[in-house]
């Protein structure tokens, strides 16, 4: 079993021995047990409140192995708008509902939700159901490690 306890400063020269694909929700868990594809058990034991991001590198406490976190493709809704103002309005309404949202200049991405999908469609956005990596904003207080 690998026990990951330390976040390592990203460095392209590091020799990563394993990748750990996690959904957005799983990347918010600071203490959790995962079983990866080959049956190996990985245990996260990070400081409470740690939110992992795609590309983060963690170190195993026993042998020092380095594991890269990868944003795992998952079901999402992608919303696009005819104007940036409409996209900003949609982001505002989703924020009022405290919904995790990935925000870019050209689209918003959120977890599937029929009520929110209907709301966004009524606002005039085009919604596409996809399976992609989901990287929502951390919020004003969510970023607690250096990048």
UniProtKB/Swiss-Prot annotation:
Any one Gene Ontology cellular component term annotated for this protein: cytoplasm
GO biological process, one term: protein folding
Gene3D superfamilies listed in its UniProt record: Urease metallochaperone UreE, N-terminal domain, UreE, C-terminal domain
Coiled-coil portions: none
Keyword Chaperone: yes
One family name in Pfam for this protein: UreE_C
UniProt-recorded Gene Ontology molecular function terms: nickel cation binding; unfolded protein binding
Cell compartments where the protein resides: Cytoplasm
Xref: InterPro entries: UreE, UreE_C_dom, UreE_N, UreE_N_sf
CDD domains: UreE (cd00571)
Annotated keywords: Chaperone, Cytoplasm, Nickel, Nickel insertion
Taxonomy, superkingdom: Bacteria
SUPFAM superfamilies referenced in this protein's UniProt entry, alphabetically: Urease metallochaperone UreE, C-terminal domain, Urease metallochaperone UreE, N-terminal domain
Family affiliation: Belongs to the UreE family.
Function comment: Involved in urease metallocenter assembly. Binds nickel. Probably functions as a nickel donor during metallocenter assembly.
Protein name: Urease accessory protein UreE
Organism: Trichormus variabilis (strain ATCC 29413 / PCC 7937) (Anabaena variabilis)
Organismal lineage: Bacteria, Bacillati, Cyanobacteriota, Cyanophyceae, Nostocales
Gene: ureE
């Amino acid at each position: 079993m690998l026990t990951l306890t330390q976040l390592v400063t990203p460095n392209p020269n590091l020799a990563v021995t394993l990748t750990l694909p996690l959904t957005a929700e799983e990347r918010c868990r600071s203490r959790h047990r995962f079983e990866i594809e080959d049956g190996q058990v990985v245990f996260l034991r990070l400081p409470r409140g740690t939110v992992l991001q795609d590309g983060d590198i963690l170190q195993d406490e026993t042998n020092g192995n380095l594991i890269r976190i990868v944003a795992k493709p998952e079901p999402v809704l992608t919303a696009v708008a005819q104007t940036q103002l409409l996209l900003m309005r949609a982001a505002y309404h989703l924020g009022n509902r405290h919904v995790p949202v990935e925000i870019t200049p050209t689209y918003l991405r959120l977890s599937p939700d029929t009520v929110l999908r209907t709301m966004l469609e009524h606002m005039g956005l085009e919604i596409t159901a996809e399976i992609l990596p989901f990287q929502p904003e951390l919020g004003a207080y969510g970023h607690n490690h250096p990048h």
